[in-house]
Amino acid sequence: MLQLTTYRNLQVFLVIMTAIGMSFALFFLQRYMGFSPCPLCIFQRIGLMIMGGFALIAALFHPKSMVIRLLLWLGSLAGIGWAAIVAGRHVWLQHLPADQVPSCGPGLDYWLDTLPMQQVLKEVFAGSGECASIDWTFLGLSIPEQSLILFSILILTHLLILWRIVRPATPKPLAR
C-alpha cells in the first residue's frame, strides 16, 4: 500500500510546491498580471528556492543516513523559515496605517550595487512603499498573506518530515 507520508513522498511534495509557487509567481503574477516583485517578494522567492533545492536533493538521492537527512531537513527548513519570516514582515508592512508606511526607495538592484550585504538586508526589512501596497487579492488575501499561509503549511510538512526521520523504525510483522 502506498504511504503518502513517507520521507521521499514528503520531499517530492516540497519540490512540487516549490515548482507551483515559483511558476505562479513568475508566469501568472509577473508575466500575465504584469507585477514586478518588490524586494521582500524576491527574498521570499529565494527562501522558497532554497527549500526546494534541499528537498530536491533529498528526493533524488533519498539518503539513508539520519545525519544526512537531518542536514538536508535543516537546510530546507532554514529556507522556508526565512521565507515565512520575510512574508510575516511583508504582511505587517501591508497592515500599517497609511501615515506609517515607509517611503519608496531605490530598487533592490541599486542597493546590491552600492551597499554592503548587511546594509541591503537592513534596507529590505525596513520596507518601502512598494512593499506596503496591495496590488491583487484572492479570497480577500493579499499575495504576502497567501504566501505566509503556504509557508506555514510547508513548515508543518517539515515537522512531519522530522518525525519521519527520527521516529524509531517499527518492526515489520513476521510472515506466516
From Swiss-Prot:
SUPFAM superfamilies registered for this protein in UniProt: DsbB-like
Q: Provide Periplasmic-side residue ranges.
A: 29-46, 89-145
Q: Which UniProt keywords apply?
A: Cell inner membrane, Cell membrane, Chaperone, Disulfide bond, Electron transport, Membrane, Oxidoreductase, Redox-active center, Transmembrane, Transmembrane helix, Transport
Q: What domain of life does the native source organism fall in?
A: Bacteria
Subcellular location(s) of the protein: Cell inner membrane
Similarity field: Belongs to the DsbB family.
UniProt name for this protein: Disulfide bond formation protein B
| Source organism (scientific name) | Psychrobacter cryohalolentis (strain ATCC BAA-1226 / DSM 17306 / VKM B-2378 / K5)
